[in-house]
Curated annotation (Swiss-Prot):
Entry keyword set: Membrane, Transmembrane, Transmembrane helix
Subcellular localization: Membrane
Highest taxon of source: Eukaryota
Transmembrane segments: 11-31, 42-62, 76-96, 106-126, 148-168
Name assigned to this protein: Transmembrane protein 212
Gene field: Tmem212
A single GO cellular-component term on record: membrane
Membrane topology: Multi-pass membrane protein
Record flagged with keyword Membrane: yes
Amino acid sequence: MKGLYQAAGRTLVTLGGLSIFSGAIAFFPVFSCKLWYTGWSVWIACPIWNGALAVTAGSLVLLAHREWTQRHLWEAVFTFVILSILGCPLHFTVALQSALLGPYCFYSFSGVAGTNYLGYVVTFPFPYTKFPSVCVDPLHYEEYHLTLQVLDLCLSLILFCVSLAVFIKLSARLMQTGYINGPENPQ
């Protein structure tokens, strides 16, 4: 049991950090520092908030494991793991929808006053292989977009599984003993 909580906590912190990073780099397409590419949408916000929940839950798991008898820490872990479980399907759905709709191309087809969002122009799902350079600026934005969405799909699935494992373990302990904090941690 000692290894499960440590592994789950470290996994939640690491993958939550990757999710926050994924949402943060989505602000700047293809690492462009042009301010007019900066955007804010649910595609960006969802990985950041879900990652923040996972990092918080993982940090609390690691802290609660060290201070085994602190009941308030285990209750906070339980709460944030539930929130993470609820956020992961939303994160997965947004990433899947975003991958199927295609990239939000800036200044495409007709210069500065371009079509902007190509999801209304091309077929559904987005034909990544048929139009290799639909987004004129920034270059390689289709590959960048698809890579970020696949990363978000994988992260949300793994975060869901790890959060669910911690939730099941804590629920089993709650049903067995009647309280959420376990016996003294031998160190």
